[in-house]
């Protein structure tokens, strides 16, 4: 059994359902400290939702050394119905060339692969020309309030600079390394409450139906072309996720209706400009309303440069593939790290089974992931030596 597979299985066997860490960080710290990493625990959140975070850094001598950070999460989503699993989700199980277990793809394999890649890289290059750090959290699959976000805020307060970040999210589609994420769209949610006047449904002249009033405005928002996107991002999208109105009775005009919606926005728009345009539409339709906004993350983009080139070269050397740069999909903790790090790239194993019953990874894909990380480290070292 390879060292990477062994560490992956050890991590899967720890039932770290968000926000629980279940001992993952202790296991990883034990592997990192012999390599010279100073490990700092940065826990956050109330006792009822305590989040475990680890900041591990290996620093060299000399001023203004660049810093590479690997970001990952030890927490996993809930298992779902246990009876639907072919094998216990926290018992690593091999079947038909695949390793089954919750977190196999998202993202315990990536964490194990990077740690082993570090072991191999530092054995051959004990004094690299850049510092290396890991930022690991047990709050990525949950609210993401007390995890990476808190650590990034602390690093910013301390003036710690990050230059390159690899996020180990599962990004591959058909083959290992065929796609990496060099950016993500921003996300912003709104909760709109349109006010009316409740009344008997047989006497509409004595009431004001907020659903009827809201519909033209919602139709206009749904039809709006917010921007045209660009070479890296599709156009910004606006979608309604929930609508709640009425008392449950069939003869009552409701007094208010609440609409939840979400923007996924690209770098052609800002959160502020989108908010202004929404308010303009609502005001144009003469609605009496309240609107609360929640910004989940700003968009970020890493154009081809030092880190993207290193990852592409590593994938090419390991697999022969010319990887696709993509900004599709949901958000990740990269949105927080991008606030203090100008180059952020996500690269990891297949995302085909993430969050599903019988989550798994093809065993033959595990070593290539580790090798891609190791080759990226080697390529960054080569670039710094030039």
Curated annotation (Swiss-Prot):
Recorded catalytic activity of this chain's protein: N-succinyl-(2S,6S)-2,6-diaminopimelate + H2O = (2S,6S)-2,6-diaminopimelate + succinate
Described purpose of this protein according to its UniProt entry: Catalyzes the hydrolysis of N-succinyl-L,L-diaminopimelic acid (SDAP), forming succinate and LL-2,6-diaminopimelate (DAP), an intermediate involved in the bacterial biosynthesis of lysine and meso-diaminopimelic acid, an essential component of bacterial cell walls.
Highest taxon in the source lineage: Bacteria
Enzymatic class: hydrolase
GO BP: diaminopimelate biosynthetic process; L-arginine biosynthetic process; lysine biosynthetic process via diaminopimelate
Keywords for the protein's UniProt record, in alphabetical order: Amino-acid biosynthesis, Cobalt, Diaminopimelate biosynthesis, Hydrolase, Lysine biosynthesis, Metal-binding, Zinc
EC assignment: 3.5.1.18
Keyword Amino-acid biosynthesis: yes
Annotated residues for binding of Zn(2+) 2: 106, 141, 355
Cofactor(s) the protein requires to work: Zn(2+); Co(2+)
CC cofactor note: Binds 2 Zn(2+) or Co(2+) ions per subunit.
Classification via Pfam families: M20_dimer, Peptidase_M20
Name of this protein: Succinyl-diaminopimelate desuccinylase
Family recorded in the similarity comment: Belongs to the peptidase M20A family. DapE subfamily.
Catalytic-site annotation from UniProt: 75, 140 (proton acceptor)
Annotated Zn(2+) 1 binding sites: 73, 106, 169
Pathway: Amino-acid biosynthesis; L-lysine biosynthesis via DAP pathway; LL-2,6-diaminopimelate from (S)-tetrahydrodipicolinate (succinylase route): step 3/3
SUBUNIT field: Homodimer.
An example molecular function term from Gene Ontology annotations: succinyl-diaminopimelate desuccinylase activity
């Amino acid at each position: 059994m390879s060292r990477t597979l062994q560490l992956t299985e050890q991590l899967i066997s720890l039932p770290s359902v968000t926000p629980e860490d279940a001992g993952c960080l202790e296991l990883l710290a034990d592997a990192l400290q012999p390599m010279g990493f100073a490990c700092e625990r940065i826990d956050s959140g109330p006792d009822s939702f305590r989040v475990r975070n680890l900041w591990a850094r290996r620093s060299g001598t000399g001023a203004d050394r660049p810093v590479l950070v690997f970001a990952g999460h030890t927490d996993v989503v809930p298992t779902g119905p246990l009876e639907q699993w072919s094998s216990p989700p926290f018992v690593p199980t091999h079947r038909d060339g695949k390793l089954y277990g919750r977190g196999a793809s998202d993202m315990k394999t990536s964490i194990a692969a990077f740690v082993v890649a570090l072991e191999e890289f530092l054995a051959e290059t004990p004094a690299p020309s850049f510092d290396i750090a890991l930022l690991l959290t047990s709050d990525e699959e949950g609210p993401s309030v007390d995890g990476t976000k808190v650590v990034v805020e602390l690093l910013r307060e301390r003036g710690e600079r990050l230059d390159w970040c690899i996020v180990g999210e599962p990004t591959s589609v058909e083959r290992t390394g065929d796609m990496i994420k060099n950016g993500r769209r921003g996300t912003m949610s709104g909760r709109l409450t349109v006010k009316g006047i409740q009344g008997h449904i047989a006497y509409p002249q004595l009431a004001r139906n907020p659903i009827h009033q809201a519909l033209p405005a919602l139709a206009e928002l749904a039809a709006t072309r917010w921007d045209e996107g660009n070479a890296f991002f599709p156009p910004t999208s606006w979608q309604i996720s929930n609508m709640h109105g009425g008392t449950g009775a069939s003869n009552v005009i409701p007094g208010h209706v609440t609409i939840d919606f979400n923007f996924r926005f690209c770098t052609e728009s800002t959160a502020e400009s989108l908010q202004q345009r929404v308010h303009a539409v609502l005001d144009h339709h003469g609605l009496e309303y309240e609107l609360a906004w929640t910004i989940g993350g700003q968009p970020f983009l890493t154009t081809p440069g030092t880190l993207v080139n290193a990852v592409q070269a590593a994938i090419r050397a390991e697999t022969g593939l010319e990887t696709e740069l993509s900004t599709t999909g949901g958000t990740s903790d990269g949105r927080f790290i991008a606030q203090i790090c100008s180059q952020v790239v996500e690269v990891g194993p297949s995302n085909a089974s993430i969050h599903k019953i019988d989550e798994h990874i093809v065993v033959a894909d595990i070593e290539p992931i580790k090798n891609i990380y190791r080759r990226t480290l080697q390529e960054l070292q080569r670039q710094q030596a030039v």
